[in-house]
Amino acid sequence: MTAASRQEVLGLYRSFFRLARKWQAASGQMEDTIKEKQYILNEARTLFQKNKNLTDPDLIKQCIDECTARIEIGLHYQIPYPRPIHLPPMGLTPRRGRGLQTQEKLRKFSKPLYLKSHDEVS
């Protein structure tokens, strides 16, 4: 990791803590605000710990872009959680063969940038 990317990553990590400190839930209720602040902190810690040993500059850049997108989307929509996405359904393809491979490729490419670190299957 270069010194410039290290500083950028540390700045993003600090911005998550600043964001959590200033966060207000859209509902205005204190319980919701506390839960959402805790979610922001836990999510940041988990993802930064998961990616701390990356050495490939391209992967580091992707993670930085994902982090920036998550911050911007959270601020714009006033929700700390990733926005739900609609992936192509797999109900019409056979269990094996080209159709399944095509559907899996579509699902892989249709996953937005801000969800690349999530291992969840929709």
Swiss-Prot record:
Disulfide bonds: none annotated. This is LYR motif-containing protein 1. May promote cell proliferation and inhibition of apoptosis of preadipocytes. It comes from the Eukaryota. Pfam families: Complex1_LYR. InterPro entries: Complex1_LYR_dom, Complex1_LYR_LYRM1, LYRM1. Belongs to the complex I LYR family. PANTHER family: LYR MOTIF-CONTAINING PROTEIN 1. The gene is Lyrm1.
